Amino acid sequence: MNLSVSISHSVKITNSKIYFDGELYLHEDSNLDAFLITAYKSLAITYPKFYKMDSMSKLGFIASELLMKNNLETEHDDYKKGLIIQNHSSSLETDKKYQASIQDIASPALFVYTLPNIVLGEMAIRHKFKGENTFFITEKFNAFELIRYTQILFDQHILCTAIIGYIEILDNEVDVFLSLIELKDNNKLFTVKNLEDLYSSQL
């Protein structure tokens, strides 16, 4: 069997819509908090810690849960499963909320989320991704850099599977795009064009 680094699934989340593999999964016109709760409930899982997460971690959790819904126990070594994520605003959304909270009483619950890579920890714990775990701050979604970095890890047999993409939220404006990358036969090839097409198809 000829295996290639391929895009198995993709998820796109905007302010009111979630797309899974290009198909509309959820549409709800409501405020962000209500939208995230509806999305979580649609997953039909019980994970109480979700309610304590900041918005960026909730977005990453929901997107990765959809990607992994049929792959919760994969055949891959947990130490060869990785996360490579980008965004533009780091954890500024939560930083601003924490800054507002310390005008009164500082919120420890918010403080623990004032690093952008905390979302990776939430995703890694849920899906046992114990390999490469990297968060890049970029001007915008950069398919070329995602592919360049991830391809090296696959070529060197450091990873067998990865969740990669972009998790951006600022002032309640959401732009999330994640893909599950695996060694597969006859799947969508892991190319800049394919990744950019998937990202832009639901803009």
What are these regions (language model features)?
Residues 1-159, 163-203:
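Conserved "HGTGT" condensation-loop signature of ketosynthase/thiolase-family condensing enzymes
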